[in-house]
Amino acid sequence: DAALELSEENPDAIFWVDLRSAEDYAKGHIVGAVNIPFAQLGANLEVLPSNKQIIMQCYSGQTSAQAAALAQMLGFNAVSFRGGMNFGWAPLELGEDTLEMDENPLPAAKSPSLDERGQIVWDAVKAYFPPEKNNIIAPADLLALVEDNPDAITVLDIRSADDYAAGHIETAKHIAFKQVGANIDQVPTNRPVYVTCYTGQTAGITIAPMRIMGYNAISLNRGMTGWDGAELPKVTD
């Protein structure tokens, strides 16, 4: 709701990006939001403004977390709308009449002025968004991988040490979210890395730079909230 308040108080200072499909955007979206489906964001980086607060929003907050992290890597002032439309906006019960149906046009594209290093990062982010891929795995699918061939994957739990100790996915390695960068050398590069947190938000933020670095990193859908909701097993050792 803080993001919504900011958008209402000073709409000209906000650039709201709805990453959902065009069909879902057309059914109703945050007032003022433009539509850039997640898979198309790389092709539309040039429309992102450098002089506004960018708010990325999707369905659950997981793809918007990736998008915001990547935009930050490019120097944009970007944040993710936590929980997305399903778990962030819907619980506020503001009513469908607070949404708008009209499509808001994208601003004109502006080519950035980049040095060699900046161009490398820009190109890497631009290539991050292949069609029909959101880098998220369902809890049941991850459990199948853990049970079938645990040595072929890494499960990375980025919650607090206390919550990890209270119960985690079998074989999961623990590195708290704020410590991942300093300990990235502990994460194997030769196998897929499945990252879990509480609801998928910080996992989304984590996998974005990891994928840019060359990791095959995927976030768990809804994090341990999704895992527990599916009543899947945990261990405490």
Question: Model-flagged regions — what are they?
Answer:
Residues 11, 150:
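Periplasmic peptidoglycan-binding/tethering modules of Gram-negative envelope proteins
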Residues 1-10, 26-53, 62-140, 145, ...:
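Rhodanese-like catalytic fold shared by cysteine-dependent sulfurtransferases
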Residues 58, 197:
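Short cysteine clusters
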Residues 15-20, 36, 142, 154-159, ...:
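Short hydrophobic beta-strand that contains or immediately precedes a catalytic carboxylate
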Residues 23, 162:
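Conserved alpha-helical interface elements of two-component signaling phosphotransfer modules
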